[in-house]
Amino acid sequence: MNEEFMKERPVLPLLLSMALPMILSMLVNSLYNIVDSFFVAKISEDAMTALSLVFPIQNFVNAVAIGFGVGINAVIAFYLGAKEPDKANAAASKGTLLSVVHGVIMTVVCILIMPGFLRMFTSNETVVQMGIQYSMIVFAFSVIISIDLSFEKIYQAVGRMVVTMVGLGGGCLMNIVLDPLLIFGIGPFPKMGIRGAALATGLGQVFTLLIYLFVYVFRPISVKIGRRYLHTEDYLTGKLYAIGIPAILNMALPSLLTTALNAILSTYSQIYVVILGIYYKLQTFLYLPANGMIQGMRPVISYNYGAGEHKRVRSIYNITLTIIGMIMVFGTVICLIFPDKLIGMFSDNQATITEGATALRIICAGFIGSSVSVTSSGALEGLGKGTPSLMISLLRYVVVIIPVAFVLSRIFGVVGVWNAFWVAELITAVAALFIYRQAVKRKS
């Protein structure tokens, strides 16, 4: 099998070779929402608010697709490391079919709930209607997103990171080109407003899938997808969900957090809801490189775990933690030096820029601490330990930050919400280190 390099190459060069294509592709992919926000902000402040309110549900759809993809990735890489290719093929085939099912369900559910969901956070009917227009189109592509992520994780499991980089990059470039054309009606294209932003995003995702399918057909990989594998290794469905469900919850929890914080912030002013939406778009530039490292690390740590290379597993964890810590230091410095310029990328409103700069300076105090929880949670997913990974994410996104944000907002006002971020990150970092060590010790 040509995946042997994952246990033979030195750890640092191996991690970088696996992670750098993912970091580049995820940085480019982060432009999906960034580009939408940039052009939508040119429409109106109401349009930007609508996009911010839809974001948690949009993020949930991605969470389901990515989270289940993590299960596909971990199971395939484990069986490749254990030299059981038939089981790897079955995992890929079953995982792809289940991803299609998930996409259909999410399309129906998300479109149905959006009107009521939007009215929970705003009484501005213009914002509600813009949110519905955007949602009806963007969620119609949920099946495409699910299949995209299934193929992405399969390619990652066999070490073909460049394929995912090209696929994600191609889709993003398509989105960047189509956004202004469809939003503002340039040339022969219709002027669709916020609906154009949604359609551009969906067509970009379709283009990504076409790239993946082209490579699968003309540049075959060691893992095969086929109907004949669907009726074998029935227990693998349970194994996929055993890792995938905690990973889905891990990915979905930020949406729950955003919804809860929007509810708190909306009691003060719509400006703060916009600021939170802008922050989450900005932080993608920081956390997506970190997540790119995790995506590069995950198949490597899973493969070596399946091959019984436990000392190498420890080395992979430690090196990944160090690199992610360096990324977070860089992000903290940038946010402290240029907060107003960063917020100003997405708003011309001086009040939003001023308040947003204050928020960014406070929130970034927790970036460095988050490197421990991000690395520990990702490593546990790669090792097939979904429950401990979920425990870390629950602490980070629900158990600590939401109560702290609520209490501090009652004492210090809106500034208390921003301070809740770094308080939660520091508490979670200590807990994550303990949970990771206990989970690894218990199994080894």
Mark where each language-model region is.
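Residue-level signal for short hydrophobic patches within transmembrane helices
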Residues: E8, L12-L31, V35, I57-V64, ...
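Hydrophobic transmembrane alpha-helices of multi-pass small-molecule transporters
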Residues: F60-A63, T107, N175-P180, L209-L213, ...
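Short alpha-helical transmembrane segments in multi-pass integral membrane proteins
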Residues: M1-A19, I76-V143, F189-I245, I301-G366, ...
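Transmembrane helical elements of multi-pass membrane transporters/channels
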Residues: S17-D36, I137, G171, G204-T208, ...
